[in-house]
UniProtKB/Swiss-Prot annotation:
InterPro entries: CCDC17. Disulfide bonds: none annotated. It comes from Mus musculus (Mouse). PANTHER family: COILED-COIL DOMAIN-CONTAINING PROTEIN 17. Residues 97-160, 219-271 form a coiled coil. Residues 58-87 are annotated as: Disordered. This is Coiled-coil domain-containing protein 17. Keywords: Coiled coil.
Amino acid sequence: MADYSGESGLLSCESCDMVFRSWALLATHTKRFCIGRLTPEVTLKSQPSVAIKRGTKIMAQEKSRDQEASTSALKRLTEETAGSPGERLRVLQGTRARRMAETEAQSRALERRGEELKRRLHSVAGPKGGLPRPFDLERELRELKEEANRTRGALQTLGAHFQALQLQPRKLQDTHRAVEFCYLPLRFNPETLAAEIRILREAYVHGGGRDPEVLDKILQLQVEASALELQRSQNRKEKLSAASEEVLTVEAENRLLEAEILALQKQKVLSLSPWGSRDLPGHLSRCDNSLLPPLVAPPIPQLTSSTKAQNFHGTSKTILNGTMTRKMGLDLHFLLPASDVLGPAPYDPGAGLVIFYDFLRGLDTSWIWVQLMTSLARNGQDTGGTTALPPALCLPQPSAPGPMGNCAILASKQPVPRLPPSPLVSLICELQAWHGVTWAPQPKAWASLLLFDQDLRVLRGRWRLPLRVYPNTSLSLAQRNEIPQAGQAELFLRLVNARDTDAQTLAEINPANAHEYQYPPMVSSSSVESSFFTHSSAFADPPPPTEEAFVSVKDKNEHLSPHQF
């Protein structure tokens, strides 16, 4: 058996003559892999193989390399630990500073590279599809200059027409104002800023101006001026002292006395003339109808006569210039209290009833003007005779609880004389609105209100009616309640007997008092139908019209007449 234990520190197996470098490998081989010696013949004839010699040589070389690596590592470690702790710390600090400087230099190089790439991308792509920015800016500046020149020319033309209109005599101005021109009058004093803007708009239109942008801008200024005037009037009302309350009360009483005097003068003239209002003097019958009081004289503005006008749909309808109760700073202490007695009350068919249209709230912010169209319906069927109330300007939302949106002050009253009571009679209100400068009103919403209960009593009260979307078809009451509401728009009105008109005329109209109005009671369709058969026999024909009423119907354009449906 060959013995290799003395060569290079190798360990040989006693059973198979294999050599190993460590005792662990030899033990593992002996325990698991050793198969013993070869046969004696082979053992005697064989010599150590070339493979074994080559493996021994390779293992010796590897061992020498490992020893050299261990020696160099030990030397390096000895050199590093040879110095003092301070020296080692300085070496580490220097190494750290050197590495940080290298890192910063690399970061700056990367940033410069990124900026260079961005510049190349901008130069390749270019702004707005490849057009260079200077040319783009030049084109925008040129367009802005052209638009400014057009606006300047329009303003100069408008100023020239306005100066020419001021130089003309008053008679010529009246002649120009008599030309048919459909515009919506503002209910403000001529001295206000809104009235001046309205005059400016008239001058622009009479001069031939039809630019929609200019008209829209003037209309926006008019709305802002109206809102500013309303805010100023509210501020003045809040600043009234106790000393001025008596003066305002005396002024209101004087206006009442003046209205009564005018009413007596009218009655005197009618009694002297056998043909009624057709023989009235010219200054009372034709041109100055605004000086005459309404049938029930209001305390502040006076009701003008009903005039025939062409509505915005092309059909002729009666426009009632209702009483516009702009309060002149009266204190609530001297007015009708908010909790006035209103509720179901006996009804006098001869006298009729009166409807006060106070205001609208929750309107869409895109609406500029609104108009209310009213009519009567029996059992859901329209009886004809639609009437248009005066248009109202949309104002900003008041700072008070209520529906969100703009508001509009209607301030109109509508007498309904000689109406037979019936639980099937209802009031139908249609809301129309103007958008922008198109001047074509569009129907937006509608509402209905029953006028009598099952006991044929008039449903007096302050009512708030939710305005519902179209279509306004002949539906039952239950079906009407299922129609969705048009946003948050609501109509606020008062329904009273004709004998209560004087007291209700003194009530203040303020959109901030929306909480004083209630929703009408819900009435089922079955109860209404049963009450119709119960009370149908009790209906009586209205009395025949008197001679004065006949004359008023014949000449309704010459004097005041009740609001007809």
